[in-house]
Amino acid sequence: MAPSTFKSPLTVTHVGTATAILEVGGVTFITDPYLSPAETSFPVRPGVVLTSHYQPSHTLESLPPIDAVLLSHEDHADNLDPSGRRLLDGRRVLTTVDGAQKLAPRSGVVGLKPWETAPLVIGGSLFEVTATPCQHLPSGECNGFIVTVPEFGTTTSDDGVSRPNAIYFSGDTVYLEELAQMRERFHISLALFNIGAAAVIPPGGGKPLLITMDGRQAARLFREIGADFLVPMHFESWDHFTEGRDGLEAAFKSEGVLDKVIWLELGVPRRVL
């Protein structure tokens, strides 16, 4: 467990791809639920198929009770598969505005614009979830999320300002300069990054388009938001991911952030804060 000013015990379990179970203070969140078995394929458009080559650590039935879902976008199967859609039923879900419309009539789904904040009362605690911008594919919306609650505590930085401790889930995005502004409002105790340098051929053809961060971009964003620790996700076992753990470790070492990285073993709960 890494030292931190974070005041609540936080355990993270990596289920696979961008799916993580966050257990904090008796409340359980899940990110981008993907639960399909190994070698499942999803046609995207003529000539383009996404295939996973790993077995998620959990099935829908073996998940712990989930209090809320942080869904970066609903229109890509590697972030929300059919089992993940079933999980949304009857639960609190934070996602994009467009995604909330497409997931209707689920009453628990809330769509947020970038930098918009929604209150979330769970277990007697008032959480606040702030959406962050993403740049993923040219069409479609995607959000990251910052989660705070008074029980997380605060951190006073070198400028003398006390800011709320927070958990940041990046969603699917490449590096965006705009994201650095979260440092003005929050102290990011833990950042979970969807990385892997995912790349796809655009609908009109041409060179592969980078749609998630590579290691160097992730290291840059990590430094700019002033986060304490980084959990890498979304870099294994899909054909459109182009940078695996070896490449990421090399990039993080070169960028001087490797000592702040927490690698998770699939399916193994880890107390990170």
Where are these regions (language model features)?
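Cap/insert and terminal regions of metallo-dependent hydrolase folds
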Residues: 94, 98, 174-266
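Structural motif
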Residues: 27-29, 67-68, 92, 127, ...
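Active-site environment of divalent metal-dependent phosphoester hydrolases
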Residues: 18, 37-38, 74-80, 100-103, ...
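Active-site-proximal loop/helix segment associated with metal-binding centers of metalloenzymes
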Residues: 34-45, 49, 127-168, 173, ...
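Metallo-beta-lactamase
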Residues: 2-7, 92-164, 251-273
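Divalent metal-coordination and catalytic microenvironments
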Residues: 22, 32, 73, 81, ...
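Pre-active-site segment of Zn-dependent metallo-hydrolases
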Residues: 2-3, 27-71, 80-86, 137-139, ...
